[in-house]
A protein has these predicted regions:
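Amide-forming acyltransferase catalytic core, primarily the GNAT-like/NAT-type
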Residues: 176-296
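Active-site/acyl-donor-binding loops of N-acyltransferases
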Residues: 157, 163-190, 282-396
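Conserved hydrophobic beta-strand within the GNAT/NAT acetyltransferase core sheet
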Residues: 117-119, 152-158, 338-340
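Active-site rim helix/loop that mediates acceptor-substrate recognition in acyltransferases
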Residues: 30-103, 218-267
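Long, serine/threonine/proline-rich intrinsically disordered regions in eukaryotic cortical polarity
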Residues: 2, 7-29
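GNAT/GCN5-related N-acetyltransferase fold signature
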Residues: 68, 93, 119, 275-277
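Intrinsically disordered, low-complexity domain-flanking/linker segments in eukaryotic proteins
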Residues: 71-84, 142-149, 249-254, 260, ...
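Glycine-rich acyl-CoA binding loop
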Residues: 124-137, 315-319, 323
């Protein structure tokens, strides 16, 4: 049927970006679920999406759904009696707290993370995804802003390389990680003691983390590049964990309780991280591809890259202790490896204490951190901005 539908090309003036009804959103969720459900059944995927839309991060306008439609159509030609419009392409955006330092001043801003960009196979090759992104880029400039908080940038993570989204302003930024295999083996090195973190530990740590980021930005030398950061607030972390817990319950019949690890007792001198587990395989015996992601790694006194870290002591050893616990959790929860995004020198040193072959991997096709900078500028924004704390917690 789809080959006979007379639909306009993506540059048609009759196309418009709108918010879908619940029925129209369900059309897209059913289609993209067939491609993205991973370890979940199709029905469980739909339930997960509904669950994630009601988290602290997403409820009350935290998530916005967008579809591209043809306003010239009187009904959905694929289902004329449904009362719905035909979604030509779709995405969702997540409202995020952001900080921007420029010209010596720190300001709070609204940002948005873009996810689930989708065009059904029967509607591809017509330019709909391109038109969607062009329209979304314009719409987000003023979406959910007010006189106190403007939107200066938006982000997305591309799984289709660096070129497509760059055509619409989302420039690729450095995207790297280190990976360690899951392991239940006790490290040979003598390491500090790492204690587990649980959900109730995270709100206070996230508040402290935001304060540390603010302090770091405010102390940037005059003349430094403009710097941006998405705030790693507890609402963001809880969204990742709600996703993890839903899939854990569906696939393994239980939810993970340990959310991270911490080394040290004195506030201001601790090293800690929190993580999430991602499963991709319906067959729970298959671990290939399943990943334990370190969402955020924090060194409270910010002494990354120090000499003792490079020598395997100090922060390098503390980070190794955190990663060793992550490896054990990864093994227990049937994930293949542990990933740390945008690793510091100390993070790499810590990883190499556990695995001498650990190295920084530059991504060039998947999970490419991409940012659209709205203020007027010449040349590549990626050359003029520092994206601070560009870690997995920012992904959506």
């Amino acid at each position: 049927m789809s080959s006979t539908i007379d639909l306009p090309k993506g540059d048609s003036p009759t196309l418009a970006l709108v918010h879908p009804t619940e029925e129209e959103q369900l059309i897209q969720s059913k289609l993209n679920g067939a491609e993205w459900r991973g370890a979940l059944s199709h029905s469980a995927y739909l339930r997960r999406e509904a669950t994630l839309s009601q988290q602290a991060l997403t409820k009350e306008g935290g998530i916005t759904y967008w579809i591209l439609v043809d306003t010239a159509l009187k009904n959905n030609p694929l289902d004329p009696n449904s009362g719905t419009r035909l979604p030509l392409a779709s995405c969702e955006t997540y409202r995020k707290k952001a900080l921007v330092w420029r010209d010596g001043k720190l300001q709070e801003a609204v940002s948005h993370g873009i996810g689930s960009v989708f065009c059904g196979q029967h509607l591809r090759k017509r330019g709909y995804a391109q038109r969607l992104m062009a329209e979304v880029g314009k719409a987000l400039r003023t979406h959910q802003t007010d006189e106190k908080r403007e939107c200066l940038f938006t982000v997305l993570y591309s799984d289709i390389g660096k070129k497509f989204y760059a055509n619409f302003g989302w420039e690729p930024f450095p995207s790297s990680h280190i990976a360690l295999p899951a392991s239940a083996t006790t490290p040979a090195a003598s390491l500090p003691t790492a204690r587990p973190l649980y959900a109730e530990d995270l709100p206070e740590l996230c508040r402290l983390d935001e304060a540390l980021i603010r302090k770091s930005l405010e102390s940037r030398p005059q003349g430094s590049k403009t710097a941006v950061a998405l705030v790693p607030d507890v609402e963001t972390v809880q969204w990742h964990h709600a996703r993890e817990e839903f899939v854990g319950q569906e696939v393994h019949g239980k939810v993970p309780k340990i959310k991270g690890a911490i080394v040290g007792d004195e506030v201001g001198k601790r090293v800690w991280c929190y993580w999430t587990r991602v499963w991709y395989n319906e067959d729970v015996s298959i671990v290939k591809g399943n990943t334990m992601h370190i969402l955020r790694l924090v060194v409270e006194d910010d002494a990354l890259g120090s000499e003792d870290a490079q020598e395997g002591g100090g922060h390098g050893a503390a980070i190794a202790a955190l990663l060793a616990m992550a490896q054990r959790e990864a093994e227990e929860w049937k994930t293949e490896h542990v990933e740390v995004w945008s690793p510091s020198a100390a993070a790499l040193a810590g990883a190499q204490i556990l695995d001498k072959s650990a190295r920084v991997i530059e991504r060039d096709s998947e999970s490419i951190a991409s940012l659209l900078w709205y203020p007027e500028h010449e040349g590549r924004a990626a050359d003029q901005l520092d994206w601070i704390s560009n870690e997995k917690y920012s992904w959506c």
